[in-house]
A protein has these predicted regions:
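Mature extracytoplasmic domains of secretory-pathway proteins
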Residues: 49-82
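Beta-strand-rich cores of mature extracytoplasmic or soluble domains
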Residues: 70-135
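A short tyrosine-centered beta-strand micro-motif
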Residues: 37-41
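Primarily extracytoplasmic ectodomains and periplasmic/lumenal surface modules that are beta-strand-rich
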Residues: 35, 46-49
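Short acidic, Pro/Gly- and aromatic-enriched capping/linker segments at domain boundaries
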Residues: 9-29
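N-terminal helix-cap/turn-to-beta initiation motif at the start of protein domains
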Residues: 28-36
Length: 135
């Protein structure tokens, strides 16, 4: 597993929090490719683990030229996330957004794996985690 330290911040708004991340590489969300840049990720439904099974994740570039809302699975933890985390998985030469956790939440958003990316011995699967030490 590779860890990637990146600029990660809590995107505060009057209505909902989110995660702001400077992603230094191209990545895929669903069937859309996003260039390297700074993005805001946030749960639109604020789903609860154990109660809800789906959420909708918003991915938006801070420059305003890229946007995607995608249905995700809800994953849970017994403890609140102490800091925001955005996880990417590299497979078949591409990097895919795989999970987003907002600080203070016990539920995260996990994107469904694409069926056309069947794991084989030839595919290298590496997880890149963008996070920061929150004090």
């Amino acid at each position: 597993m590779l860890s990637l330290c990146s600029s990660v911040g809590l995107a505060q708004s009057s209505r909902q929090a989110g995660v702001a991340v400077k992603v230094p590489f191209e990545f895929v969300v669903g069937n859309q490719t996003f260039p390297a840049g700074t993005y805001k990720f946030r749960s639109l439904l604020n789903s609860v683990a154990g109660k809800d099974t789906i959420d909708v994740l918003e991915v938006r570039s801070v420059e305003g030229h890229m946007y995607r809302a995608i249905v995700t699975d809800v994953v849970g933890s017994t403890e609140e996330a102490s800091h925001p985390r955005v996880r990417f998985t590299r497979s078949g030469g591409q990097v895919f957004l795989s999970e987003v956790w907002e600080a203070g939440r016990t539920a995260g958003c996990r994107l469904q794996k694409r069926a056309d990316l069947e794991q084989t011995a030839a595919n290298e699967d590496v997880t890149l985690i963008a996070s920061v030490d929150w004090r």
